[in-house]
Amino acid sequence: MKQKKSIYYKSTWDYKKIRPKIRCFIEDEFVIDLTKILEDCDKTESGYLDMRGFDFSNLFSSQSAIDTLLKEYKDEENLKTHLSKYGWSEYAINSFISQSKSQPITKSYHGVFIIRLGYKQKIDFSYSESKFATEINENLDDCIFEDCKHNIEFRGELTHCIFRNYKTGCPYIGSSNYNTKCTFDNIIRGNTSYLSFKPNVTYQSCKFLHTHFKVVSLHGTVFDNCVFDCTMEGEGIRPIEIPDFLDELKYRFSLGLGAIFNGKIIPVKFINCDLSKLKLKNLKISKGIKFI
């Protein structure tokens, strides 16, 4: 049934028709602005903007990159002037423009693609896909990511978002900033098994369900009022240890003096969490860790 739904939602998108609505421009990174697409979105039966089945990899046609960019910058000189404002060297600019005349943007540009949505609330991305390394920097609230295959990193805050049956190309789960009241249910890492939590990120009132985390290290992550019904397994010959304050201090010393004075030293914290169904494999928690 899910496969049929996925095929149906994917078939509803006419990328040739919607590409003229996309703005493409370069700031510090390459930005793909989808505001016009979301403006014209229908709503689901639940009242969400309907982005179900959207394939972010189909945003670009096979036309040369220069054709895509000149829609925004009009001519090459304007493009060169714009790139120089963002610190591009003359050599880098000329090389990029040369490649852009013979290759699509996905081959001529080697950085990360930034997706700009223009909308931040109540979007349903179920059955959507993305193959390229992309980022969404906006804060998102009450969005649905079910049965997705993504290579998206979330830089903004996530609130009330649902990730279910979610296959990711990224090594970390959720936002690399702050996560509040999000559900992570059956998260699967594609290609490799490493799936963990980004250092110095807070998860507030989140649920981690039916997921097998493969942890190489864990530093500075705060879990506040979270529920764990999942497995955490250490990746290594010896058991991985979740560090307390002293262990974290030793770790900073190993990185050099700059790491010691670069911000507060925050050990991993579990504050009022339900760990009754958390399974640990090849992983142990330092005695100094406090379960508040």
Model-assigned labels for residue ranges:
Residues 3-16, 20-292:
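Tandem repeat scaffolds
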